[in-house]
Amino acid sequence: HPKRHAMEGTFTLGCDENGIFTGLDCEIYFDTGAYASLCGPVLERACTHSVGPYCYQNTDIRGYGYYTNNPPAGAFRGFGVCQSEFALESNINLLAEKVGISPWEIRYRNAIEPGKVLPNGQIADCSTALKETLLAVKDAYESNPGRAGIACAMKNAGVGVGLPDKGRAKLIVHDGRVELYSAASDIGQGCATVFVQMVAETTGLGKEKIRNMGANSEVAPDSGTTSGSRQTLITGEAVR
């Protein structure tokens, strides 16, 4: 099975005297090995997430995938985002040092807020709470110099790219218990357990009163693919 893409890239990040980001220029190269596999979609995610959860005045992001005689690379946890986010966060730490402010402070000043627009055109909705999250860890970070690090990242969930996405579930009360039917495949990520927890939380019932009937497409509604970290988010909301 293909694993994570090896990445090389150049990230150039600029800011003003107050640490406010003025621009980001990225050039990303992915080694996809001997076969393309999912290099295209993975590279797309690496590029769209290379800006992180921050505001910018200007951005220019370019990504390239190339064949080599190495083993194939493809879909792997994080789907390209880990590589570009690591490069950006490392750059932010270096920039904070040059400006003379803390790594926490430069992230707080540039954090995306509700109503602001990410470089990919997405408007941050009311659930965006990056600044609140940074405030929650500020004391722990600043009271442990040299031992605690800090970084921010975002990751899409679901199929994305504007395609319709849906999840379905069916709940039946039988012999005093709730039977949960969903065709979502649990391949180790734990969605079968999460669905039961969501029913228990929503109804107030004990988990012993809820039974997950397993992924059986003959009796359960179509819940879509197990990919893109989407089952808990999409089918989970149907369960709720």
Task: For the regions a language model picked out, list residue spans one by one.
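Beta-strand segments within the central parallel beta-sheet cores of soluble alpha/beta enzyme folds
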Residues: 1, 22-27, 103-112, 145-153, ...
